[in-house]
Amino acid sequence: MAGLSSWFRIPEKFKILLILPVQIVMNFIAIIPFALTWYVGMTNWVPQLTIDWWRAQFIGPIAFVYAINDQIFLAAVARTLFIGAVVVPIEFLLGFLLAYVFLGKFIGRKFVTLVAVVPMMVVPAAGGYVFYLMFVESGPVNGLLQIFTGISISFLSNPTWALISIMLADIWQWTPFIFLIMSAALLSLPQEPINAAYVLGASKWYAFRRVIIPMLKRPMMIALLLRAIESLKIFDYPYMMTQGGPGYATQTITMNLYESGFKYLKYGKTATQSLIIFIACIIVAWYAVKPLRAAQRGE
């Protein structure tokens, strides 16, 4: 008992004991569904053929070969990566620019800042429906185009314009996310190095490039990483605006998995493809945070 009481007096060990039950429960909640998904992904389970998942034919790692050979799935992956490669840099540049402009004091700054973050508070499904009403053939966007140019564009039925419309909606909603992160980062910057640069004769542009940007490296990388991961989950806008169409022209990873699992009931194949995406995201995130860890060790 004496040894046990002395163990409790050690702050670090006592803290571990306090969080241990919660950690065990959380691990249990996370591991069981993951293990079940992994097993189902190794089968060809289709409820119409085999109602019980444990009776489905076990096909092993060959399931990954079947999943990767799905051309519609691969096209959805490529399309999602393309959307992310376009919208994330644009959102970052716009968000950072807004944060830097709003850094100064001016009349109505708080109100303008509040208006700027409103899109992020909108439910994505509702935002998708609003953009659908805007870009539909008889919507206000085409109405304005006909008034000023005399032309009409099939925004949601043309594959290229449908993809552009979805990306515009995504940029509208997620630019405020970058804006908030970079605003907080800019406000937390120490002013001494910046003022010292001005005293030494540096121009605003030079101080911005050589002093401010290096100090913002970590917040920038965090914002880009979080937004890049989030862009892989885009579902609401393609679903609400185009239903993945025309054809499969705007179908993303999440839409493909949704249709494969809930529409065609190919649970085994859907589980395998979900695991592929999960593993790929873990690998990318692992290498993406390496510079952050290196910067932290260097401080």
Model-based region annotation:
Residues 1-10:
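Short, Lys/Arg-rich, polar N-terminal cytosolic tail immediately upstream
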Residues 11-299:
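A structural signal for multi-pass alpha-helical bundles of membrane permease subunits
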